[in-house]
UniProtKB/Swiss-Prot annotation:
Positions of 4-amino-2-methyl-5-(diphosphooxymethyl)pyrimidine binding: Q37, V38, R39, E40, K41, N69, S108, K137
EC number of the protein: 2.5.1.3
Signal peptide location: none
Catalytic activity: 2-[(2R,5Z)-2-carboxy-4-methylthiazol-5(2H)-ylidene]ethyl phosphate + 4-amino-2-methyl-5-(diphosphooxymethyl)pyrimidine + 2 H(+) = thiamine phosphate + CO2 + diphosphate; 2-(2-carboxy-4-methylthiazol-5-yl)ethyl phosphate + 4-amino-2-methyl-5-(diphosphooxymethyl)pyrimidine + 2 H(+) = thiamine phosphate + CO2 + diphosphate; 4-methyl-5-(2-phosphooxyethyl)-thiazole + 4-amino-2-methyl-5-(diphosphooxymethyl)pyrimidine + H(+) = thiamine phosphate + diphosphate
Protein's name according to its UniProt entry: Thiamine-phosphate synthase
GO biological process: thiamine biosynthetic process; thiamine diphosphate biosynthetic process
Organism from which the protein derives: Clostridium botulinum (strain Kyoto / Type A2)
Function description: Condenses 4-methyl-5-(beta-hydroxyethyl)thiazole monophosphate (THZ-P) and 2-methyl-4-amino-5-hydroxymethyl pyrimidine pyrophosphate (HMP-PP) to form thiamine monophosphate (TMP).
Keyword Metal-binding belongs to the record: yes
Family annotation (HAMAP family): TMP_synthase
Pfam families for the chain: TMP-TENI (PF02581)
Gene Ontology terms: cellular component: cytoplasm
Length: 205
């Protein structure tokens, strides 16, 4: 499956401001988002399922891949395109056994060692970060900057997206590393005009 990782949106319902998540995701896709990850923390399984199913109606309509953060059961239940796993989540090999070879599995990495391990274990793509300081990541030691991103990117051969503090003022510097895409939350979701916010993060608009 050929995936376009150029503009990777991660959902966060804290930014809804009374708006409908389905509408936000649709506007983001119309603005240029190429892949959507549904991430829900501290909610029941049923609520996560309902949110993911709702988002999938939109991504299916626009033929955009939908990735589920961490929860393989939710990914299976809605027949998502794949899952994204952190370093402390289920091991990639086990996830692959459960989901099969046709599903996308992405892994979060913060250094070359983690990146090579994920690649060797069969990850389809990597989420590399944290690139810049961000409100959602309080661990300053985890910030790797453009230099850290470049080192990791140069060590691997699979697609990757950069994450962490990326916005319309710095995304071009990130893309100069040759990375396949950028992953954002607030740079799109915290804006009033979702479609425009997404469009402002496209290099070839």
């Amino acid at each position: 499956m050929e995936i376009n990782y150029e503009l990777y949106l991660i959902t966060d319902r804290r930014f809804l401001k009374g708006r409908q998540l389905k509408k936000i995701v649709e506007d983001a896709i119309l603005g240029g988002v190429t892949i959507v990850q549904v991430r829900e923390k501290d909610v029941s399984t049923r609520e996560f399922y309902n949110v993911a199913k709702e988002v999938k109606e939109v991504t299916d309509y626009y033929k955009v891949p939908i990735i589920i953060n961490d929860r393989l059961d939710i990914a299976q239940a809605i027949d998502a395109s794949g899952v994204h796993l952190g370093q402390k989540d289920m091991h990639l090999n086990i996830a692959r056994e459960i989901l099969g070879k046709d599903k996308i599995i992405g892994i979060s990495v913060g250094n070359v060692k983690e990146a090579l391990e994920a690649q060797n274990n069969g990850a389809d793509y990597l989420g590399i970060g944290t690139i810049f300081p961000t409100g959602s990541k309080k661990d300053v030691d985890a910030i790797i900057g453009i230099d850290g991103l470049s080192k990791i990117k140069d060590s691997i051969s699979i697609p990757s997206v950069a994450i962490g503090g990326i916005n319309k003022t710095n995304f071009k510097d990130v893309l100069k590393t040759g990375i396949e895409g950028i992953s954002v939350i607030s740079a799109i979701l915290d804006e009033d005009d979702i479609k425009l916010a997404a469009n402002n993060l496209l290099i070839n608009k």
